[in-house]
Amino acid sequence: MNKLITLILVCCFAFNLYAEQLPAKQFSHPERIRYDQHCFTIEGRDIFILSAAFHYFRVPQELWRDRFRKIKEAGFNTVETYVPWNWHERTMPRNVKDYSQCDFDDLKAWLKMAHEEFGLYTIVRPGPFICAEWAGGGYPRWVAKFCPAKYDTSFWLRSNHPEHMKWTKHWYDAVCPVFAEEQLTRKKSGEKGIIMVQLENEYIYFGMESEKKEEVLRDMAAYCTNNGIEVPLFTCVTPEVRGSKDAVISQLFDMDNQYVWWNIQEAKSRIEDLKRQQPNAPAFVCELQGGWFSTVGGGLSEDSYLDGRHARGMALMAMAGGSTGLNYYMFFGGTNLAGWGARRMTTSYDYGAALKESGGVSEKFAAVKGVGDFVNRFGTQLARSEAIEFTTSDNIKDLTVGVRRTKEGTLFIFIFNKDKKKAFRDNVQFHIKGMPAFNVYCSVEPLDSKVLVLSQANGQCEWYPKEQTLPERPVNMPMPIRIAQAERCDETFQGNWRPLRKGVSLPEIGVNDCRYSMYRSVVQLSKKEVEEYGTLVCEMFTADPLYVQVNGKIAKRASTDELDNTFVIDGLLHEGSNEIVSIYENRGHAHGYRPMEELSGMKSAGLGKKQSAILPIEKWEVKKVENNVKDIKSLLSNNEGWETIMLDQSTIANLATLQIAGLEKPEWPAAWVLQGKEGTAIYRTSIDMTRQMLTEGQTMIEFACVDDAGTLFVNGKEVASHDAWDKPFVANMKDFLHEGENKVAIVVRNSSGAGGLLKGIRLFSELKILKPLKWEVALDLGGVTQGYCGGKTAGGDNWKVVTLKTDGTLHRKGNNIQPKGKQDALLTWYKVTFDLPKTEKECWIPWRAIINASGTGYMWLNGHNIGRYWEEGPQREFFLPECWLNMGGTNTLVLGLRQSETCGAVLEGIE
């Protein structure tokens, strides 16, 4: 025991010495706000910061007040938000000094409401990269226009490249002055304001050298201070900041993000690690993850099964480790209205949060409210408490225990029961230096946590958090409304058409969101040309699909890959005038890696030669091999250890979800061979080439995604290499093929994350544009232009009444449970109306729509875009914001559904 105490004293001495060697923290207004190794001190008072993440851009402004009220009721003293650049500057400015396209009215209103109406401090996180499962991670789509041709980092955005930093400065110069006036330092004493501003976001996950990251952080800090930001600046999960001796970076402090799931005890150890690495700043959790996001084709937030025990336990274990600042991410998640979520994100951003998407509360809300009550009672004491060493009886193997003591001697004993099934009910004996041994009877449910407050002053002890009560539910709920019929109309393409200049993207002409747009070309063809051309070849700015009709007939895609924008139009063309119309579906702006820096829309398109066939190559064998492949022939001739994989369309769709959501292993384990690992795998297949295929040049092979890099071999000879994981790998094998069976192999090298062949492979004749076409573009669908979204049914005879199912259950969630129909148009509009009862003002009841339909598109409630409906699911239930409903009156719900090639667009039922 004496050796242990000596070791502790030595460690504490080394810890303090290390802290003293770091540059002293400087504060613009230390009398208003400052911090030390323990906590924040605001206007002379030590504060335990309990913060709720609440994104103002994910809920209608009319509902902010309700969400703030519930945040306040739960005991929070602070609220946190990201500030998305692309939300506030939606149109490309004329130049880097032009700020005329920025609109910050909602940000200013939100800050004012938080500070003045609800007395909450705020934390602002302006990026420019925010992640947040938000379109582009916050970057405007138009920024990609300025992407340099060459750069030496993993990708351009987030890097130290001068062009990126120039536009980052543009953003900071625009946004910082807006919220500078809302800083605590600009307010009167006693008023609330912004207490912290974040630079960048989770920089640890961006692949760039530390020196370059430090350069970025120094510049960002200067952009802030030059624009009047006086409150402390921070980062999250950015190791370069922790313990830095750099003159600028040492004035920042880093926070932890905790994704501990049910390993709740890690919340304590992570905070202890943070305090060791950063001994001169408070230990703050920027994202205390109490839930998770939903993904298209994956699972919903509710499927993560993180309940009130989890929300309570994370907070208490972080406090046990010494945290004096916690930000629940998300406390309120909200909705990705109008498709503003990142690629493959559902409309719901409920996040499994304590405050539900609809504003409802649950047992998780009660659990967090209990934490809030505890912090409000003891936060000031906890802020400067110290961890103390102790020993216990040996019956606590299933418990994680932490003890902290205040200057006054009050003890906080934190306990977490790690056992998943068995409650802990027993006496635990504590031995603390300078105190007589004492027993504590602990009764803790499985995976639950508590804290015992033991007062030295009066010897009283009491368990926290206290159980909280939830509001009473209404006794008489309104009956569900099952819609019996709808009106249906196919898209007429009567948009506002304008000439499209060659090579111009949609962001350059004002489309920076994820709406549907249209392209049209009218071309005169001779009889000879009709016989010559048989494909429409489209080049895109990013991996989004087009849907095409030629002379009123739907053109089929050249392969099973939905992102293959080559169409077989042989038989659809005729001599004379031909009209080609296409709908562009923006699948969403990726929030990570190189797809972030891609423009959107169609780059060019024209007619190509006829294709005899485009063959998908779906059946492969794979095995993991040594990194340095020298003798490819020996490897291929050895038939041991190979596993068969089918790279068909369903496999590819499933893998796309797995890459984003990190879900369970798939049924096809071979595709998982390089998941999350550094390594090499070899894939092999056989292709039987006929003389006709060789004569017609059907020798091009395309791998839609080789992650991270690959080398192609044909019949044992090296053909080509490729190292751009986000670009297709296309090679011509004509010089290596012969009639009959050919052995094709690709060696794939992966450094991190998902690796291998992640998309489809096809064999075809060379596809190129032989006859370029002139195009027009319409920025919106014809139905949007004609007012369908608001319920207008212009077009008269185009609208038909259809009957919906009114029996049976409509499932509120599920993947691939949509009704099956046949594609008979590119896009179809549906309109339903329903009457809602009046409700008493003191009675609040949220409404939702359960929809079962095939097709993918957007939904409008009384003219407001409430988000995106994805055919594949899993989301089938959608929040209807009460501020957009006509209570006691008639409401209109409109769906614009792009028909799927396999199921059409069938609206089966709405409730």
Task: State where each predicted segment sits.
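Glycoside hydrolase catalytic-domain groove-lining segments
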Residues: G243-G297, M314-A315, L355
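Aromatic-lined ligand-binding clefts that engage carbohydrates, nucleic acids, or primary amines
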Residues: V523-L525, E529-G552, I580, W642, ...
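Carbohydrate-binding surfaces of carbohydrate-active enzymes
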Residues: M165-F179, Q183, G190-L199, Y205, ...
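An active-site-proximal structural segment forming one wall of the substrate-binding cleft
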Residues: D103-V124, A149-I194
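Aromatic- and acidic-residue-enriched segments that line the glycan-binding/catalytic groove
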Residues: P93-C102, G127-L157, E209-K213, L217, ...
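Aromatic- and glycine-enriched glycan-recognition loops and surfaces
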Residues: H55-E73, R94-H115, E215-V216, V530-G534, ...
